[in-house]
Amino acid sequence: MGLGKGKDEYKLAATSEDGGKKDKKAKAKKDMDDLKKEVDLDDHKLTLDELHRKYGTDLTRGLSSSRAKEILARDGPNALTPPPTTPEWVKFCKQLFGGFSMLLWIGAILCFLAYGIQAASEDEPANDNLYLGIVLSAVVIITGCFSYYQEAKSSKIMESFKNLVPRQALGIRDGEKKNINAEEVVLGDLVEVKGGDRIPADLRIISAHGCKVDNSSLTGESEPQTRSPDFSNENPLETRNISFFSTNCIEGTARGIVINTEDRTVMGRIATLASSLEGGKTPIAIEIEHFIHIITGVAVFLGVSFFILSLILGYNWLEAVIFLIGIIVANVPEGLLATVTVCLTLTAKRMAKKNCLVKNLEAVETLGSTSTICSDKTGTLTQNRMTVAHMWFDNQIHEADTTENQSGTSFDRSSATWANLSRIAGLCNRAVFLADQSNIPILKRDVAGDASEAALLKCIELCCGSVNEMREKYPKIAEIPFNSTNKYQLSIHKNTTPGETKHLLVMKGAPERILDRCNSIVLQGKVQALDDEMKDAFQNAYVELGGLGERVLGFCHYHLPDDEFPEGFAFDTDEVNFPTENLCFVGLMAMIDPPRAAVPDAVGKCRSAGIKVIMVTGDHPITAKAIAKGVGIISEGNETVEDIAARLNVPVSEVNPRDAKACVVHGSELKDMTSEELDDLLKHHTEIVFARTSPQQKLIIVEGCQRQGAIVAVTGDGVNDSPALKKADIGVAMGIAGSDVSKQAADMILLDDNFASIVTGVEEGRLIFDNLKKSIAYTLTSNIPEISPFLLFIIANIPLPLGTVTILCIDLGTDMVPAISLAYEKAESDIMKRQPRNPKTDKLVNERLISIAYGQIGMMQATAGFFTYFVILAENGFLPMDLIGVRVLWDDKYVNDLEDSYGQQWTYERRKIVEYSCHTAFFASIVIVQWADLIICKTRRNSIVQQGMTNRILIFGLFEETALAAFLSYCPGMDVALRMYPMKPLWWFCAFPYSLLIFLYDEARRYILRRNPGGWVEKETYY
C-alpha cells in the first residue's frame, strides 16, 4: 500500500458476492502484507514546484476553502478508523464457554439428562444427578465471572490512538491563517506548527525556523530531531523535511503541506497494523486444551467400556446409559478449573508486587515459557536519561559516574582545565531545573531543555555545585542558539573573575566544527598552540568516544580583549561583530543513555536460563552495539563481522558471516532480506542487535522468531512498538515511559520500566508451570478412589461405596485449599538454570502424570477406601464375599428382611444408614490418603527432607481438609443435608497404613529417580 499516491488508489476493490470468504481472506492477507511493507513515500524528494503540481496547493495562500471541502467530502475526516471491537457480552461468554469450562458444561448437561431419564422411568428418582448438575453449572458460572473480572480489559488500542489526535490545527486557506478542527485537515492543506503543538497529519516541510520534533513515539529515538526543508535522507522516516502525524513539535516553527491524512499517515498505518493483528492462543491455553483431550479420552473410554459391560451383565439400556453418564461425569475434576484460575491469580498478584502487572491471567505462564526476548533499548535496557559518561581534557579521557545512585568512579577535578570546561558547559547551556526541587536528588530533578543540555546541567551541578550561582556570577549578554547549519551554540557573558577580561565568549557544538574554529588549546590550565600532534590526539579521543556509541560535544572559549570590547559593548548576533574564529579549545564531553544497573545481571540470568535476548532499536548501530556490549547482549569475546574484519585488517566482504557469533543488522539491510535470509540469520547467530528498525520491521523480526518455534516476549514503550507487542506471545509494555497505545497492546506492564523485572516474571512463570503440574497431579489422584466405587457397584453388584454428594464434598471441599496451596510451593532447584520448556514435548499434563495419578497413587487410595468400606460392612454383619450381587435387593425399598452373613434381617432404612456411614468413612479415607498425596506432590524430584515443610499454606491446607471432613461427619443435621453420618473414631485409622505406604512408595521412586537420572524410572514416571 503505497503512501502519498492520492486517495483513489486506497479505495478497496469490492468483493463480489460469490467471491465469498476466500476472496475476503486473501484480501485481508494482502492488506496485512501491505501494512507490513516499509513506508513508500517520495514526497520528500520532490521540489516545491513538483509539490505544487501534485497537490494543487498555492505554497503561500494554501488551498481555497471550496477545494478543501471537496477533498474532505472525497477523503473523509482526518481521523483513525476504529477497529471492530468485541462486545463485552461476547468476552463474558468466552470466559463461560472456553476451554475447561466446556468440559464442566458437558458434565452438567449429562447430569440433567441422567436425572431426566431417572425421573421418567422411576417413581421417586434420587436427586444426586440434579444436585451435581446444579453444582457443576454454579462452579462454571462463578469461575467464569471471576476470570472475566480479573481480565476485564477491552482492546482499547484504537481508543488510545485517538488521544494522539490533535484537536486543533493552524491552517492557511485563501491566504488567511485559520484555526481548523484537526479532523477537517485535508490532503494538500498548508499547515503551520510551533513548539508545543502536535503535528496534525504527515507534513512535507517547506519552511522552518529552529524547528525540532520529538519522534520517540514513532522511531524510538530519544533525541529531538531537527526539521527543515532540506531533503537529507532517502529514507522518509529519517529525512529532515517530513514530520509525522501525532509526533510533537518541541521548539521553533515550521510550515508544511499535508501529504497524508487519517489511516494513510505513518502513524495510521501502525494503528491499523496493531489493531488488525490476531494474537494466537497462549501456551497455557494450548496445555489446558491438551489436558481436556486426555481427560475426555479417559472418561469416554471408561464410560463406553462399562456401558458395554453393563449391557453384557444384563442391565437394561436405560440403566446402562445412566452408568455411562455417571462414569463420564465422575471423571470430570470439578474443582480443577477454580484451582487453576486461583493459582494463576495468586501468581499475578505476586508478580504485581515485583513490578510486573499482568493484564491477562494466562500471560503469567507464557512468560515462563519464553525462549526469546526482543527488547527495546531506550528506557528498558537503559535509564532513559542522557548522562555525561566521559570527558577529554588535558589530553586524557576521564570517566564520569553514570550509575543511578552515583556510587561509581569519580575523576580528578583539581585541574584548572576542568574548571574551564565545567564553566563553559554550565554557561553555554539553556537547560534549567524546574522550580521547587531543592530537596530532590540532582539526578531525579526535572529539567526544562533538551536531553543533552539536561545531562550537562546535572553533571556540572553534581561536580561543581549550583549552576544557577555560576550563571548569576557570569550574566549572559548575548547568545546564538544552536542551528543545523552552524552546528554550534554560542553565548557571551560578563566576567567578574579577577585577572581575566571583562567578557567571556563560550561555545559548544559538533567537535570537528569547534576544533576548526580554534588555534589554541588549554592544557593543565595553560594555553598552548593547537599543533598537529594535539589535533591527532583530539581525533583519536573523538573516534574512541564515538565508537562507544556516545554523543560527543566540543567546548571552547575566548576571553574577548577589553580594548575592543569595553563594558557596555553592544554585541550583535545577527550581523556578528565579535570573533567566532581563532578561539581556544578546552575539551570534549561525551554523553550516553547509560544501561540500568540491574540489566547486565538480568541478561546473564536469561542466558543461563536458555533465553535468547535480541535488541531491537530505532537508534544508531554504533550506540546500539555499545549498549549491547555494556549489558551483555553481545558477550565479551564475541565478535561481529565488522570486528573480525578490523582485527584481520581485511574488507568486511571477505569475512564469512558464520564465523561471527554476534551481529548488528541495520534496518536498511533488513529491508532487503527475504524471510529465508532472516530465518538463517536468527538461526546461526546467538547474539543479535537490530538497529535503525521501523515498526513494521519489529513485527517482521517477531514473526521470524516465531517461525523458529520460539515463544517470543517483546518489550516496548512507543506507539511504534504496538504491532510487535500485539503479535508477540507476550507483549511487555513500560509503565512509566510507555505510551497508552503500547500499554493497551501488551499483556503485561513493567511498573518500573526495568528489564530486570522481566527476569523475575520469567522465574514466576516457570514456577507456576511446575506448581500447576503438582496441583493437577494432586487433584487428579482422588479421581480413581471416586470412580472405582461406581465401577465396582456396576460390575460386582455391591452396595454403592461412595455417593455423588460425597464426591462433590471432596472435589469442591476438602481438596480445594490443599490444591491451591501447592501454588505457594518454592522451586525445587534453580529453575533459571534450565532451558525453556519445549511446548511440543514438555506438556502440563502428560501420559506419565496420568500414569502416576491414576495408575499408581490413585489405585493405592482406592484400596484404602475399599478396605474401610469392607471393614464397616463386616462390623455390621455383611462379609465381603456375601456382598457380591446383593445390590438389587439392597436398593429395593420394598425389601425389609434382607439377611446378612449371620442371618440377621435388615430393613431398607437401616441398610441405607449403614451405606451412608460407608460413604462418610470412604470420604474420610480419601482425605487421609490425600494427606500423603499432598506431601508427595510438593516435589517431583527432591526428597521431602530436602524440600522441607516450609510452605505454611500447605500445612494449613492439611489441617483445613481434616477439620472440614470432621465437621461434615459430626455436625448435627448433615445426615439429612448431605447424607453424612457420624463415624466411630476407629474408622478414621483404617486408611493410615495406606497413607504411609503412599508416602514411602513415592519417596523410594524419587530416590531411584535421583540415583539414576535418565533411567527407566525417570522415563516412565517423571512428570
UniProtKB/Swiss-Prot annotation:
Propeptide stretch(es), residue numbers: 1-5
Chief location bin: membrane
Transmembrane segments: 88-108, 132-152, 289-308, 321-338, 773-792, 803-823, 844-866, 919-938, 952-970, 986-1006
UniProt binding sites for Mg(2+): 717, 721
Short name of any one Pfam family annotated for the protein: Cation_ATPase_N
Catalytic reaction equation(s): K(+)(out) + Na(+)(in) + ATP + H2O = K(+)(in) + Na(+)(out) + ADP + phosphate + H(+)
GO cellular component: membrane; plasma membrane; sarcolemma
Keywords: ATP-binding, Cell membrane, Ion transport, Magnesium, Membrane, Metal-binding, Nucleotide-binding, Phosphoprotein, Potassium, Potassium transport, Sodium, Sodium transport, Sodium/potassium transport, Translocase, Transmembrane, Transmembrane helix, Transport
Residue ranges of the region described as Interaction with phosphoinositide-3 kinase: 82-84
Residue(s) carrying Phosphoserine: 16, 943
Active site per the UniProt annotation: 376
InterPro entries per UniProt: ATPase_P-typ_cation-transptr_C, ATPase_P-typ_cation-transptr_N, ATPase_P-typ_cyto_dom_N, ATPase_P-typ_P_site, ATPase_P-typ_TM_dom_sf, ATPase_P-typ_transduc_dom_A_sf, Cation_transp_ATPase_P-type, HAD-like_sf
Molecular function, one GO term: ATP hydrolysis activity
Amino acid composition bias (Basic and acidic residues), ranges on this chain: 1-11
Ranges in the topological domain labelled Cytoplasmic: 6-87, 153-288, 339-772, 824-843, 939-951, 1007-1023
Cited NCBIfam families: ATPase-IIC_X-K, ATPase_P-type
Subunit structure: The sodium/potassium-transporting ATPase is composed of a catalytic alpha subunit, an auxiliary non-catalytic beta subunit and an additional regulatory subunit.
Protein name per UniProt: Sodium/potassium-transporting ATPase subunit alpha-1
Provenance organism: Oreochromis mossambicus
